[in-house]
A protein has these predicted regions:
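Intrinsically disordered, Lys/Arg-rich low-complexity segments
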Residues: 2-124
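Rossmann-like S-adenosyl-L-methionine
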Residues: 3-8, 278-280, 284-288, 292-531
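Immediate flanking context of iron-sulfur cluster ligation sites
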Residues: 122-138, 169-178
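Flexible, glycine-/basic-rich loop-and-beta segments that form/coincide
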Residues: 127-133, 209, 529-531
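Extended interfacial segments that mediate partner engagement and assembly in macromolecular machines
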Residues: 140-241, 261, 276
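Short, solvent-exposed loop/turn elements at beta->coil junctions and helix N-caps
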Residues: 172-179, 244-245, 253, 257, ...
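Short, acidic/hydrophobic/Gly-rich beta-strand patch recurrent on exposed beta strands
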Residues: 201-204, 268-270, 399
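Short, aliphatic-rich beta-strand segments
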Residues: 256, 263-272, 330-334, 455
Length: 531
């Protein structure tokens, strides 16, 4: 910024072909020194400026000389003492080289050459976009608006290093080649603005005021277009938006999910009541605008709550879910299913996690907080047995379906709290027979009768894991624990517990799943070293 201000100030200066600057100074010992400097700037000025300075010299060789060249850049040299080179100011886009100074007893001759050279940024560093998102100050969703992507990665790298670096080596963060429109899940809240205009977008940070958004740089473009057209259809079909204050109205939210590889699109209409007038005609009109839509689901949320989705659902078009592929497996994604929003970076993250597990085909693994079974099913072909546990019943049903869809027969799924499940496994190994309920809802034979586990994958929510889970991991003592985290702070807290109880953190790999936000994913390998 200092360079820019100097450049702006100097551009306002009047420069003639030959400019003479005369400075008078008082000299002791009646010594006068005349110093002439020629400056050539190839980018702006091809003239020679003569600078005559009369400097005061005290005693032997102490010279104070201030020379100022007014050009596109500003160079100030302060020299004190003998044969001492000083660094010069380096404007953006210019490279400055200075010849060696020759100092005589009462005179200094210095030649400074300004050579304009375009400073080329490395291929890995792209220039920051000049235009910020038009919703940046209202939406609040993207924490890093105004920062170049390279700067964002450096910030996240430091964030992970600060929290995890004390436990193990932190590898350089893996960023995206194209950090735009990566979100395969888009949610919009609907409202009426002053004047009766239908708007949709997100809540303004800290409020329930809706910020109207037509398009978002991190959201799937197809999803944004569908949401915009739904706004228009509401007017045509005279469907009112839901009013949170009064409880009147129908449409509350719209959720759009799109398969990155499959291209399948699911639209979820969240209503305040179970009846959508002219629903068939509405779907027909919507699909006429967007034939890529493969399914439409009505979700009923008739409670005054901040939750987006309600309990009841009805499929009004298509199969009620979409499918997509990840790391070679096909996954079923329902309206409520947890599925990472950035499939490109998720493949990188999960591939690294399975690499850390060091599977040989003989291991019994636990996939805790499994969601729809992604990590465990991807790892199944490299393991002897997979035991997956998830609290969300709908997600577990999808996981069971996904195992069948991929013809995976060595995986079993349990609908249970991960912490309690691990406690029971540890107790069972200690000959206390407490069996969890399988996902089918029927009591069945224990998946691990001896309670032995070789590898644990854990991917908890932002709050991290809990002591019940972690203490059970310590009791079961698997050889390796692969911890996937979306919060470096809670990750550090849990690593502290595990490292105090026989585990050593070996390596951490940060992966940027959420460009333009402060959030970052990390995967850590932990090895059991004994108590």
């Amino acid at each position: 910024m200092a360079d820019k201000k100097a450049m702006n100030h100097n551009n306002k200066s009047v420069m003639k072909n030959k400019s003479v600057m005369k400075n008078k100074s008082e000299a002791k010992n009646k010594s006068e020194v005349k110093n002439k400097s020629e400056v050539k700037n190839k980018s702006e000025v091809k003239n020679k400026s003569e600078v005559k300075n009369k400097s005061a010299v005290k005693n032997k060789g102490e010279v104070k000389n201030k020379g100022e060249v007014k050009n596109k850049g500003v160079v100030k040299n302060k020299i004190t003492g003998k044969k001492k080179d000083r660094e010069t100011v380096k404007p953006m886009g210019e490279k400055i080289t200075a010849s060696k100074e020759r100092q005589k007893k009462y005179a200094i001759e210095k030649t400074v050459k300004l050579a304009t050279e375009k400073r080329t940024a490395p291929k890995t560093e792209k220039k920051k976009q000049n235009d910020m998102c038009q919703y940046a100050k209202k939406c609040g969703g993207c924490d890093y608006q105004g920062l170049s992507y390279e700067k964002q990665l450096r910030e996240k790298q430091e964030y992970v290093r600060k929290n995890v670096g004390g436990f193990c080596r932190v590898l350089p963060i893996i960023g995206m080649e194209n950090p735009y429109h990566y979100r395969n899940k888009v949610h919009a809240v609907f409202d009426i603005a002053k004047g009766g205009t239908v708007i949709s977008g997100v809540y303004k940070a800290g409020t329930h005021d809706v910020v109207n958004i037509d398009s978002c740089r991190i959201e799937d473009e197809t999803a944004d277009a569908i949401i915009r057209d739904i706004r228009g259809l509401l007017r045509s079909f005279k469907i009112k938006t839901y009013d949170e204050d009064t409880g009147y109205g129908l449409l509350r939210h719209v959720l759009v999910r799109r398969g990155f590889h499959s291209g399948e699109v699911m639209v979820v209409l969240v209503l305040g009541s179970p009846i959508l007038p002219s629903k068939n005609n509405f779907v027909k009109a919507l699909r006429k605008l967007h034939p890529e839509i493969t399914t439409v689901v009505l979700n009923v949320n008739d409670k005054k709550t901040s939750m987006v989705l309600g309990e009841k659902e009805a499929v009004i078009y298509g199969k009620g879910y979409i499918e997509d592929t990840l790391c070679g497996c096909t996954f079923r994604i329902s309206p409520k299913s947890f599925y990472q929003v950035n499939p490109v970076q998720t493949e990188i993250l999960y591939t690294k996690a399975i690499e850390y597990a060091g599977l040989t085909g003989k291991e019994r693994i636990v996939d805790a907080y499994c969601g729809i079974g992604t990590i465990g099913l991807i790892a199944a072909s490299k393991a002897k047995e997979v035991i997956s546990v998830e609290l969300n019943r709908d997600a577990v049903k999808d996981a069971v379906t996904n195992a069948k869809r991929n013809d995976i027969k060595n995986a079993q799924f349990y609908n249970a709290d991960a912490g309690q499940f691990m406690v029971e496994m540890a107790e069972y190994r200690d000959d206390q027979k407490k069996n969890p309920t399988p996902a089918s809802g029927k009591s069945g034979k224990r998946a691990t009768p001896d309670g032995n586990v070789d590898v644990v994958f854990m991917d908890p929510p932002r709050a991290g894991s809990d002591e019940a889970f972690l203490s059970s991991v310590v009791r079961l003592a698997p050889k390796r624990v692969v911890y996937i985290s979306c919060n470096p702070e809670t990750l550090a807290r849990d690593l502290k517990y595990l490292t105090k109880h026989g585990y050593e953190a070996r390596e951490c790999q940060p992966v940027d799943l959420f460009p333009w936000t402060k959030h970052v994913e990390s995967v850590v390998l932990m090895q059991y070293c004994g108590k």
